[in-house]
Amino acid sequence: MLDPLYPLFPIFAFLGFVLAILPLPWHLQAWNSGTCFFMMWTALGCLNQFINSVAWADDAMNKAPVWCEISIRILMGASVGIPASSLCIIRRLYYIAKVRAVSKTRAEKMRAILVDALICVLFPLVYIALQYIVQGHRFNILENIGCYPAVTNTPVTYVVSYVWPVLLGLISATYGVMALLQFNKHRLQFSQFLHTHSTLSASRYLRLMALALTEMMCTMPLGIFVIVLNSKTENIQPWVSLAVTHYGFGRIDQVPAIVWRSQHLIVVCNELTRWCAPVSAFIFFFYFGFAEEARRNYAAAWRRVCRALGLPERVPSLPTTKKPFSSSDNKGSGFAEKFAAKAKGFSNFNVKDFTSEFTSKAHDFTSKAKQYTLPRPMPQTLSSSGFSSSDSTRFGSSVDGKELPSPTTKEFSSPIPIHLSGMQTLASFDSNKDLPSPPAYDIEAQYGPYNIDNRVSYHIADTGVRASYPMGVAYSSDSEHRRIVPHHSTVPHHSTADEPASPALPDTPSSCSSSATFSTLQSRDFIVLPSSADVTRRDSGSSAGGVASTSRPTRAGPPRLPSLSQLFGISSMRGQEGDVEAQGEEMAADVDVSEMVLDTLAPASIIAATTTAGAPATTTPDRGEPDVPTSPRTHRASV
């Protein structure tokens, strides 16, 4: 009859042998004699059960009588060797918890090992020898189990065989309770004591305690169960003499599985006996197989095996990316450490010192602006009398020693500060990244005549296509059709004594705010601004009491904006007809204002057209929407 647990039990028995013997080398180095004896007895018990379960898996023949003589004695020794090892472990832990001096010299260590060897080795050997007193014949062979001791059921048997595992468990329990009490009583001294011993830590101490207590809780119930079971399954025979007990000692009983499995209590007793060693091995590995020292030794053993087989010892690890702001390649790591140190003592934290230190370190992490590779046009300067018909201002040119930035066909990567009406904002001009790179355009801004509503309009011409745009309106271009579209809100014109106030348009969201201050302009926006010549012409026309022109512009526009002086808070211009000196100052001031607008609003496209006094007013018919690029391009303002 085949074993119903075959091959499950042989596999578990062999795994228990490997798991129990694997940590033995480094425990020998640490002089843990009790733990080493526990591993030895557990490994022997697992190996013995593995061989028996494989050799007699489906029969009860006497195949190896010599092995059976050895096997039954291993089984006898393991039945008390494992509990005795647990006793040595917990006894050693008790002396440590009592904060007594653990052996330091070699002689003291050898004395401690000798005591443990007497308990874990000599006592099991004596126990094995005493089993001859109660041994009725050589051995039994149980099908599916293998070799099994044959002892008589007499009162002497309970004293010689069955009581010792229970007694060892009781002694271990006593030491365990005392160790826990001492540990709780001397916690401070215990922690200081552990620091002086490199081979023992608090984690290992607690794991050893748990192992011993677990083994004790498994051994004592099992020993009691065996005593009760033997007393009930068979009648207890009186002890007569040793000769009566050994009558027919050379007999070997071969018991088929169908016979011994017919009684449920005997099945339970036999299964518990053979599963005891594998379970002890797995319990030990659970407590010590995943510790840090175990992992280190596993790695060392793996390297030795790979070296012997000629295999690579370690698999190359994948390249790891450096952490940002690491201490090896970052200048700001010291700042992070100082910040952490200050955070610990927050009561002495000085905000002023922190902010100054942060300011000094912030420049280390700023990125440099990209270099613009677009070739710039040749520098052209302004004439001293203002803008003439032949003068033009281009981005990339020099105006009174100031160089204007060149437009780029790609996005602007760095923020650009804009100062408007006393406020400073940051605009990141990245709205052109989805646009292609068209060729540069020359956009002309021409002066348009006054209309009957006293509004000023300007003409913007591009490759022959001209259109008129009212002054003071913010425009933006459509990214798809490349057409200029006016916004629906303007800066309100503040009325003067001789001019009526213009009705303000409703305040709707756009890139140009309807309040007195501008919001951040995008790079595709521009606003048509008046010039000093317009102010001079308007003032001179008002003083003469006449209207310069009655022709209506090609497009109706929103109310007129004030002059640059009123718009940017500069003192009002003194424009009087015939006053050449005052007019020259006006032109100089207006040129400065134009430079300020170009500097502060760059790279936004700002078309500010100026004209000289006396220039003829022209009106160009509207031929449709001009094709104006959405990003800043080269501009030319002329009359």
From Swiss-Prot:
Major location category of this protein? membrane
| UniProt KW keywords | G-protein coupled receptor, Membrane, Pheromone response, Receptor, Transducer, Transmembrane, Transmembrane helix
Q: Where in the cell is it found?
A: Membrane
Under the cellular component aspect of Gene Ontology, which terms does the record hold? plasma membrane
So where does this one cross the membrane? 8-28, 37-57, 70-90, 113-133, 163-183, 209-229, 272-292
Q: Does the keyword Transmembrane apply?
A: yes
User: What domain of life does the native source organism fall in?
Assistant: Eukaryota
Record flagged with keyword Membrane:
yes
Topology versus the membrane: Multi-pass membrane protein
Any GO molecular function: mating-type alpha-factor pheromone receptor activity
**Please, one GO biological process term?**
pheromone-dependent signal transduction involved in conjugation with cellular fusion
Where do Low complexity bias regions lie? 383-398, 541-551, 611-621
Q: Where does the record place the region Disordered?
A: 375-416, 490-516, 532-563, 611-639
Question: Which protein family is named in the record?
Answer: Belongs to the G-protein coupled receptor 4 family.
This chain's function reads:
Receptor for the BAP1 pheromone, a prenylated mating factor. Has a role in the initiation of B-regulated nuclear migration.
Q: What protein name applies here?
A: Pheromone B alpha 1 receptor
Task: Please report the organism this UniProt entry assigns to the protein.
Answer: Schizophyllum commune
Q: What is the lineage of its organism?
A: Eukaryota, Fungi, Dikarya, Basidiomycota, Agaricomycotina
